[in-house]
């Protein structure tokens, strides 16, 4: 083997190793706890809301329109209540985005999901009164979608994409590949995902994640 071939093989091996490491690092950066925030409410309970494993996969828009941004959202939101009366806690857990756009003429957002993609996390169905060892979750309905007009830009708008009723001292919700689009936006679009816990008493706490660029 000539010296030139040995050098060429060494360069290709180094390039492949660096590329593989880059892909592994990018995937690991979004695993685990992303962000959290706590609040002591009016009843001296500590309300904590968290975002886990957040990943927004921006894809080329199917309509091939330069003013459309399309993505799929996966992740989990969890809440913890500690203090007096935590077992009797009732409220709502919301997920959504802050959407920033530099210029637009009538921006619209669409977001949709199918019920098997929304899972109640940390729920125990093996104990009474359920006593179930396994569960199959068919679609409760074909899907749910929201549409909103964000108006003319530039601007920052906040949209709650879905919410679930929760009770007890802890719980969560998981979403996998929920579909979202923004139309009518010129330039880059930034999405900042959030999770919000709202108690039945009106107290609320919101945690915001890092912005995701949907160029």
Curated annotation (Swiss-Prot):
<comment type="subunit">
    <text>Octamers. Probably forms a goblet with the wide end on the exterior of the outer membrane and a central channel. It is not known if mixed oligomers of MspB with other Msp subunits form in vivo.</text>
</comment>
<dbReference type="InterPro" id="IPR015286">
    <property type="entry name" value="Porin_fam_mycobact-type"/>
</dbReference>
<keyword id="KW-0732">Signal</keyword>
<dbReference type="Pfam" id="PF09203">
    <property type="entry name" value="MspA"/>
</dbReference>
<keyword id="KW-0812">Transmembrane</keyword>
<keyword id="KW-0472">Membrane</keyword>
<comment type="function">
    <text>A backup porin induced when MspA, the major porin, is deleted. Probably forms a water-filled channel which favors the permeation of cations. There are about 2400 porins in wild-type, 800 in an mspA deletion and 150 in a double mspA-mspC deletion. A triple mspA-mspC-mspD deletion mutant has low but detectable channel activity. Different conductance values with maxima at 2.3 and 4.6 nanosiemens might be caused by a simultaneous reconstitution of MspB channels into the membrane or by the existence of different MspB conformations.</text>
</comment>
<feature type="signal peptide">
    <location>
        <begin position="1"/>
        <end position="31"/>
    </location>
</feature>
<dbReference type="GO" id="GO:0006811">
    <property type="term" value="P:monoatomic ion transport"/>
</dbReference>
<keyword id="KW-0813">Transport</keyword>
<keyword id="KW-0134">Cell wall</keyword>
<keyword id="KW-0406">Ion transport</keyword>
<keyword id="KW-0998">Cell outer membrane</keyword>
<dbReference type="GO" id="GO:0009279">
    <property type="term" value="C:cell outer membrane"/>
</dbReference>
<keyword id="KW-0626">Porin</keyword>
<protein>
    <recommendedName>
        <fullName>Porin MspB</fullName>
    </recommendedName>
</protein>
<keyword id="KW-0964">Secreted</keyword>
<keyword id="KW-1134">Transmembrane beta strand</keyword>
<dbReference type="GO" id="GO:0005576">
    <property type="term" value="C:extracellular region"/>
</dbReference>
<dbReference type="GO" id="GO:0046930">
    <property type="term" value="C:pore complex"/>
</dbReference>
<comment type="similarity">
    <text>Belongs to the mycobacterial porin (TC 1.B.24) family.</text>
</comment>
<dbReference type="GO" id="GO:0015288">
    <property type="term" value="F:porin activity"/>
</dbReference>
<dbReference type="InterPro" id="IPR036435">
    <property type="entry name" value="Leukocidin/porin_MspA_sf"/>
</dbReference>
């Amino acid at each position: 083997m000539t010296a030139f071939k040995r050098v060429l093989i060494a360069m290709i091996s180094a390039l492949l190793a660096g590329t593989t490491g880059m892909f592994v690092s990018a995937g690991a950066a979004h695993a685990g706890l992303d962000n959290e925030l706590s609040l002591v409410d009016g009843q001296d309970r500590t309300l904590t809301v968290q975002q886990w494993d957040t990943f927004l996969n921006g894809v080329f828009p199917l309509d091939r329109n330069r003013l459309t941004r399309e993505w799929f959202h996966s992740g989990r939101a969890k809440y913890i209540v500690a203090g007096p009366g935590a077992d009797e806690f009732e409220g709502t857990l919301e997920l959504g985005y802050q959407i920033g756009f530099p210029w637009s003429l009538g921006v619209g957002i669409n977001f949709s999901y199918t019920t098997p993609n929304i899972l109640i996390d940390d729920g125990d169905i093996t104990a009474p009164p359920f006593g179930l060892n396994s569960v199959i979750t068919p679609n409760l309905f074909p899907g749910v979608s929201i549409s909103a007009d964000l108006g003319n830009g530039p601007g920052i708008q906040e949209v709650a994409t879905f919410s679930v009723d929760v009770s007890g001292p802890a719980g969560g919700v998981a979403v996998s590949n929920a579909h979202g689009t923004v139309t009518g936006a010129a330039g880059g679009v930034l999405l900042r995902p959030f999770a919000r816990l709202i108690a039945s008493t009106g107290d609320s706490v919101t945690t915001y994640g890092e912005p995701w660029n949907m160029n």
